[in-house]
Protein backbone atom coordinates (compact mmCIF):
# COMPACT_ATOMS: atom_id res chain seq x y z
CA UNK A 1 0.00 0.00 0.00
CA UNK A 2 2.66 2.55 1.03
CA UNK A 3 4.97 1.74 -1.87
CA UNK A 4 2.14 2.08 -4.37
CA UNK A 5 1.02 5.42 -2.92
CA UNK A 6 4.58 6.76 -2.77
CA UNK A 7 5.19 6.05 -6.47
CA UNK A 8 2.48 8.57 -7.37
CA UNK A 9 3.30 11.26 -4.79
CA UNK A 10 6.12 13.57 -3.77
CA UNK A 11 7.35 13.01 -0.24
CA UNK A 12 5.46 16.14 0.85
CA UNK A 13 2.21 14.80 -0.59
CA UNK A 14 2.94 11.32 0.75
CA UNK A 15 3.49 12.64 4.27
CA UNK A 16 0.50 14.99 4.23
CA UNK A 17 -2.02 12.86 2.35
CA UNK A 18 -1.03 9.28 3.21
CA UNK A 19 1.09 8.95 6.35
CA UNK A 20 -0.56 11.65 8.45
CA UNK A 21 -4.16 10.45 7.91
CA UNK A 22 -3.03 6.84 8.41
CA UNK A 23 -1.37 7.61 11.73
CA UNK A 24 -4.34 9.69 12.90
CA UNK A 25 -6.63 6.75 12.12
CA UNK A 26 -4.36 4.37 14.00
CA UNK A 27 -4.17 6.73 16.98
CA UNK A 28 -7.96 7.05 16.99
CA UNK A 29 -8.35 3.26 16.85
CA UNK A 30 -5.96 2.91 19.78
CA UNK A 31 -7.87 5.53 21.82
CA UNK A 32 -11.08 3.55 21.20
CA UNK A 33 -9.31 0.35 22.37
CA UNK A 34 -9.79 -1.23 18.93
CA UNK A 35 -6.07 -1.93 18.66
CA UNK A 36 -3.28 -2.35 21.18
CA UNK A 37 -0.35 0.03 21.58
CA UNK A 38 1.97 -2.53 19.99
CA UNK A 39 -0.01 -2.21 16.75
CA UNK A 40 0.57 1.55 16.72
CA UNK A 41 4.26 1.11 17.50
CA UNK A 42 4.65 -1.53 14.79
CA UNK A 43 3.06 0.73 12.20
CA UNK A 44 5.22 3.68 13.30
CA UNK A 45 8.37 1.54 13.12
CA UNK A 46 7.54 0.35 9.59
CA UNK A 47 6.90 3.90 8.39
CA UNK A 48 10.07 5.15 10.11
CA UNK A 49 12.17 2.51 8.33
CA UNK A 50 10.52 3.34 5.03
CA UNK A 51 11.15 7.08 5.43
CA UNK A 52 14.78 6.44 6.39
CA UNK A 53 15.28 4.42 3.21
CA UNK A 54 13.68 7.18 1.14
CA UNK A 55 15.85 9.87 2.77
CA UNK A 56 18.95 7.91 1.76
CA UNK A 57 17.96 8.16 -1.92
CA UNK A 58 17.89 11.95 -2.11
CA UNK A 59 20.88 13.94 -3.29
CA UNK A 60 21.78 17.25 -1.65
CA UNK A 61 21.67 20.45 -3.71
CA UNK A 62 24.35 23.08 -3.49
CA UNK A 63 23.40 26.22 -1.63
CA UNK A 64 20.90 24.66 0.76
CA UNK A 65 21.55 24.45 4.50
CA UNK A 66 23.01 21.61 6.49
CA UNK A 67 20.28 20.73 8.99
CA UNK A 68 20.85 18.74 12.17
CA UNK A 69 17.57 17.10 13.26
CA UNK A 70 16.83 15.98 16.80
CA UNK A 71 14.10 15.68 19.36
CA UNK A 72 14.19 17.72 22.55
CA UNK A 73 15.38 15.92 25.69
CA UNK A 74 12.73 13.58 27.06
CA UNK A 75 11.01 13.07 23.71
CA UNK A 76 11.40 9.73 21.94
CA UNK A 77 8.78 9.57 19.15
CA UNK A 78 10.74 9.95 15.90
CA UNK A 79 8.06 9.70 13.22
CA UNK A 80 7.21 13.41 12.98
CA UNK A 81 10.88 14.34 12.89
CA UNK A 82 11.51 11.84 10.09
CA UNK A 83 8.58 13.17 8.08
CA UNK A 84 10.03 16.69 8.17
CA UNK A 85 13.52 15.41 7.39
CA UNK A 86 12.24 13.44 4.39
CA UNK A 87 10.43 16.45 2.95
CA UNK A 88 13.48 18.70 3.28
CA UNK A 89 15.89 16.01 2.03
CA UNK A 90 13.76 15.56 -1.09
CA UNK A 91 14.12 19.31 -1.68
CA UNK A 92 17.92 18.98 -1.49
CA UNK A 93 18.83 19.92 2.07
CA UNK A 94 21.72 18.09 3.67
CA UNK A 95 20.06 16.35 6.61
CA UNK A 96 21.70 14.79 9.65
CA UNK A 97 19.32 13.08 12.06
CA UNK A 98 20.78 12.23 15.45
CA UNK A 99 17.47 11.09 16.92
CA UNK A 100 16.37 11.29 20.51
CA UNK A 101 17.61 11.29 24.09
CA UNK A 102 20.40 13.79 23.40
CA UNK A 103 21.00 16.42 26.11
CA UNK A 104 21.02 20.00 24.79
CA UNK A 105 24.72 20.47 25.50
CA UNK A 106 25.49 17.40 23.36
CA UNK A 107 23.17 18.73 20.63
CA UNK A 108 25.25 21.89 20.64
CA UNK A 109 28.44 19.87 20.21
CA UNK A 110 26.84 17.83 17.41
CA UNK A 111 25.65 20.95 15.59
CA UNK A 112 29.11 22.48 15.75
CA UNK A 113 31.01 19.33 14.77
CA UNK A 114 28.62 18.63 11.86
CA UNK A 115 29.07 22.22 10.64
CA UNK A 116 25.30 22.66 10.75
CA UNK A 117 23.66 25.82 9.49
CA UNK A 118 20.46 24.85 11.32
CA UNK A 119 19.62 22.78 14.38
CA UNK A 120 16.01 21.63 14.07
CA UNK A 121 14.00 20.44 17.07
CA UNK A 122 10.62 18.74 16.68
CA UNK A 123 8.09 19.09 19.52
CA UNK A 124 5.12 16.71 19.48
CA UNK A 125 1.71 17.71 20.82
CA UNK A 126 2.37 15.54 23.88
CA UNK A 127 5.62 17.32 24.82
CA UNK A 128 5.22 19.19 28.10
CA UNK A 129 3.84 22.61 27.16
CA UNK A 130 5.62 24.27 30.07
CA UNK A 131 8.99 22.95 28.80
CA UNK A 132 8.85 24.05 25.15
CA UNK A 133 9.86 27.71 25.57
CA UNK A 134 12.50 27.10 28.28
CA UNK A 135 14.05 24.36 26.11
CA UNK A 136 14.25 26.68 23.11
CA UNK A 137 15.66 29.59 25.14
CA UNK A 138 18.27 27.37 26.79
CA UNK A 139 19.29 25.84 23.46
CA UNK A 140 19.59 29.31 21.91
CA UNK A 141 21.93 30.36 24.72
CA UNK A 142 24.08 27.26 24.15
CA UNK A 143 24.43 27.45 20.37
CA UNK A 144 26.65 29.90 18.54
CA UNK A 145 24.57 32.58 16.79
CA UNK A 146 25.92 31.32 13.46
CA UNK A 147 23.67 28.26 13.85
CA UNK A 148 19.97 28.95 13.43
CA UNK A 149 17.38 27.06 15.45
CA UNK A 150 14.24 25.82 13.72
CA UNK A 151 11.45 24.65 16.02
CA UNK A 152 8.55 22.68 14.62
CA UNK A 153 5.78 20.24 15.42
CA UNK A 154 2.38 20.75 16.98
CA UNK A 155 3.96 21.22 20.41
CA UNK A 156 5.26 24.68 19.49
CA UNK A 157 1.71 26.05 19.27
CA UNK A 158 1.87 26.80 23.02
CA UNK A 159 4.60 29.41 22.48
CA UNK A 160 2.91 32.82 22.40
CA UNK A 161 5.92 35.01 21.62
CA UNK A 162 8.59 33.83 19.19
CA UNK A 163 11.92 33.52 20.98
CA UNK A 164 14.66 35.68 19.49
CA UNK A 165 16.97 33.64 17.28
CA UNK A 166 14.47 30.79 16.79
CA UNK A 167 12.50 30.22 13.59
CA UNK A 168 9.08 28.79 14.42
CA UNK A 169 7.84 26.46 11.68
CA UNK A 170 4.18 25.51 12.00
CA UNK A 171 3.74 23.16 9.03
CA UNK A 172 5.61 21.33 6.30
CA UNK A 173 4.94 24.00 3.70
CA UNK A 174 6.63 26.59 5.94
CA UNK A 175 9.58 24.23 6.32
CA UNK A 176 9.95 24.00 2.53
CA UNK A 177 9.79 27.79 2.24
CA UNK A 178 12.38 28.17 5.01
CA UNK A 179 14.88 26.24 2.86
CA UNK A 180 14.92 29.01 0.28
CA UNK A 181 15.03 31.94 2.70
CA UNK A 182 18.28 33.46 3.89
CA UNK A 183 19.25 32.13 7.30
CA UNK A 184 18.40 34.55 10.12
CA UNK A 185 21.43 35.14 12.27
Please describe what each predicted stretch is.
Residues 34-36, 42-185:
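C-terminal regulatory/effector modules of DNA-binding transcriptional regulators
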Residues 1-59:
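Long amphipathic alpha-helical segments
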Amino acid sequence: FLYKKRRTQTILDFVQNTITPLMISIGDAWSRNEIDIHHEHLCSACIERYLQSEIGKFLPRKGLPVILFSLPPGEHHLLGLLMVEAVLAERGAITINIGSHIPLNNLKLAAISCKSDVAALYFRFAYSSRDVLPTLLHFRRLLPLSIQIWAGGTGISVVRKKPKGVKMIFDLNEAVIALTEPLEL
